[in-house]
């Protein structure tokens, strides 16, 4: 290990660093520090985009779907049923459909949770409003 100073990022909580101990060929114990990444650091690094995965997956899914369609069309235009290129095309096609379906499912689940939160906050407002006029 080097004796360089470790630069701390201001404003982030210090997380405990797990230690991995190993023995090398000479019988010496080597200690390796493995830093943990907290949720705050992850949110800062990604710009808060870690909860919007379904929006990031859609462009990749469309590209994979188009690629799968083209490869499958080329493979079947040469009547190469069961060849490697036709299997690759079908795999890409099904992967694109799977990615689109999973992003749509994630979007639907997120919309439901937003509706539930909105409904819950409206219920709280109505209860508070009844208390004012009672």
Curated annotation (Swiss-Prot):
- What's its membrane topology? Multi-pass membrane protein
The processes (GO biological process) annotated in the record are: angiogenesis; arterial endothelial cell differentiation; BMP signaling pathway; epithelial to mesenchymal transition involved in endocardial cushion formation; in utero embryonic development; Notch signaling pathway; positive regulation of endothelial cell differentiation; positive regulation of phosphatidylinositol 3-kinase/protein kinase B signal transduction
Q: Indicate where the modification Phosphoserine is found in the sequence.
A: 15, 121
Q: Which InterPro entries match?
A: TMEM100 (IPR032536)
User: Which keywords belong to this entry?
Assistant: Cell membrane, Cytoplasm, Developmental protein, Differentiation, Endoplasmic reticulum, Membrane, Phosphoprotein, Transmembrane, Transmembrane helix
Tell me the superkingdom of the source. Eukaryota
Q: Where are the transmembrane segments?
A: 56-76, 84-104
List localization entries.
Cell membrane; Membrane; Perikaryon; Cytoplasm, Perinuclear region
Has the keyword Transmembrane helix been applied to this entry?
Answer: yes
Oligomeric and partner information: Interacts (via C-terminus) with TRPA1 and TRPV1. Interacts with TASOR.
Tell me, in a sentence or two, what this protein's role is. Answer: Plays a role during embryonic arterial endothelium differentiation and vascular morphogenesis through the ACVRL1 receptor-dependent signaling pathway upon stimulation by bone morphogenetic proteins, such as GDF2/BMP9 and BMP10. Involved in the regulation of nociception, acting as a modulator of the interaction between TRPA1 and TRPV1, two molecular sensors and mediators of pain signals in dorsal root ganglia (DRG) neurons.
State what protein this is by name.
Transmembrane protein 100
From what organism does this protein derive?
Bos taurus (Bovine)
């Amino acid at each position: 290990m080097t004796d360089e100073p470790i630069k701390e990022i201001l404003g982030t909580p210090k997380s405990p660093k797990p230690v991995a101990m190993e023995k090398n060929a000479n019988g010496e114990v080597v200690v390796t520090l493995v830093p943990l990444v907290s949720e705050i650091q992850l949110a800062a690094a990604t710009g808060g985009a870690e909860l919007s995965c379904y929006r990031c997956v859609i462009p990749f899914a469309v590209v994979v779907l188009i690629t799968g369609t083209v490869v499958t069309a080329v493979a079947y235009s040469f009547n190469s049923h069961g060849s490697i290129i036709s299997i690759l095309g079908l795999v890409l096609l099904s992967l694109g459909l799977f990615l689109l379906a999973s992003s749509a499912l994630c979007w639907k689940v997120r919309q439901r949770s937003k509706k539930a939160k909105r409904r819950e906050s409206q219920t709280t407002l109505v209860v508070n409003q009844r208390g004012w006029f009672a």
